[in-house]
Amino acid sequence: MLIALPAIAERLPDPVAAGWQGKPVCEILHEDGALRVFRCTFPPGVGHERHFHATHFGYALSGGTMRITDASGTREVTLTTGSSFFSDGIPWHEVVNVGETAVSYLMIEPK
């Protein structure tokens, strides 16, 4: 099920276009008419500037501790390598790796 995101998402970059201090953090691995697959990597102290997400599935290639800020506030989340998640979409959030190890996600978005 695809959902409509609020208007704020129309003014923000998607996760591939968003970066950190002018540098990309995500790389497209595959894209076709049905889906887009990309990997985002965050060394310690590196984050992802404010962006939105369409419907997506995520898989933690390497876990760690991320600080996430969104409409509900700021929290720290520890991801375990091999964990996965699904989201119908995120109007906006920004994250930063506050741990001591690199964090890497594989993201899959249906089109």
PLM regions and their residue ranges:
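A short glycine-rich, His/Asp/Glu-containing loop-to-beta-strand
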Residues: 19-49, 54-58
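Histidine-centered metal-chelating micro-motifs
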Residues: 45-48, 84-96
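Short acidic-glycine-tyrosine-enriched beta hairpin
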Residues: 31, 72-90
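Ligand-binding loop in jelly-roll beta-barrel domains
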Residues: 90-111
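Boundary at the C-terminal end of the N-terminal hydrophobic targeting segment
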Residues: 7-9
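Glycine- and acidic-residue-biased ligand/ion/polar-headgroup-sensing regions
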Residues: 53-72
